[in-house]
């Protein structure tokens, strides 16, 4: 039996490797493993809770330098007076707002989910939108 979905996932994983984006490649390979093993029974949970769990992990990673003391309070306070930091804050707010609209769009217009997901993966892979630290 020819599995088109598996072929698409393999292609996207290859794109992740070709673009040296291990975040995309590893994420898709994990999903492939889930798909081809008995773990596939977890897909409903992954689909329902995966985004929330991912955002929690992302937030932990972003906040870790503050919690560990690596980012001193003086640097954090300075970010509110430096123009580059203020621009970074504004961009962060805008990106968060866009992300929220994308999640709402996915819920309200499910027919757009496939295009939005493929576009996100391609954007990350080709334009290095999210990269793991080396």
UniProtKB/Swiss-Prot annotation:
The chain crosses the membrane at residues 14-34, 51-71, 86-106, 110-130. One of its GO terms (cellular component) is plasma membrane. InterPro entries: UPF0756_TM. It holds the Pfam family DUF441. It comes from the Bacteria. Its main location: membrane. The keyword Cell membrane applies. It is found in: Cell membrane. Keywords: Cell membrane, Membrane, Transmembrane, Transmembrane helix. It is a multi-pass membrane protein. Belongs to the UPF0756 family. This is UPF0756 membrane protein YeaL. It comes from Salmonella typhimurium (strain LT2 / SGSC1412 / ATCC 700720).
